[in-house]
From Swiss-Prot:
UniProt keyword list: RNA-binding, Transcription, Transcription antitermination, Transcription regulation
Membrane spanning stretches: none
Gene behind this protein: nusB
A Gene Ontology molecular function term of the record: RNA binding
The protein, known as: Transcription antitermination protein NusB
């Protein structure tokens, strides 16, 4: 479960990197600042805020995986984008929904550069993220592109 939550948070941070046009170091620093501020507020109030269902508990996140993967995606973004773009029919990266692109980059990185994650797991997790965060067509689209990337290897 820890890897699943870590992957989800990594995708969210990749999305944030694209929207804010920040690098992974800036995103990690922003995350650390937010966590510190939340801890300060909780200690002042003497209570722990209720966690909403959509929020990811950092105790359930593998921060080493998160940082390693964010860095890897950033450092290999050109290669990842070339592989992704190769399998886009009548589309360009600029036309993709940012959430779909974040999922594709994350899972393509796992397929192409990570020996820790079997290709079928990366594909299935990408589809699950697409079901949760993408539109109705995202899961099939993500599945098709990632499957082609995995098969080329």
């Amino acid at each position: 479960m820890k890897r699943k939550k870590s992957r989800e948070m990594t995708m969210q941070l990749l999305f944030e990197m694209m929207i804010k046009k920040e690098n992974y170091v800036e995103i990690i620093n922003t995350l650390k600042e937010a966590l510190t501020e939340e801890e300060d507020i909780n200690s002042i109030l003497g209570e722990k805020k209720e966690m909403d269902e959509e929020r990811i508990d950092l105790d359930e996140v593998d921060l080493e995986y998160l940082i390693h993967t964010l860095k890897g995606v950033e450092e290999n973004s050109k290669v990842l984008d070339e592989h992704i773009e190769k399998y886009l029919k009548n589309w360009t990266l600029n036309r993709l929904a940012k959430v779909d692109l974040a999922i594709l980059r994350l899972c393509s990185y796992e397929i192409l550069f990570s020996n820790e994650v079997p290709d079928n797991v990366a594909i299935n997790e990408g589809v699950e993220l697409a079901k949760k965060y993408g539109d109705d067509k995202s899961p099939a689209f993500i599945n098709a592109v990632l499957d082609k990337i995995a098969k080329q290897m």
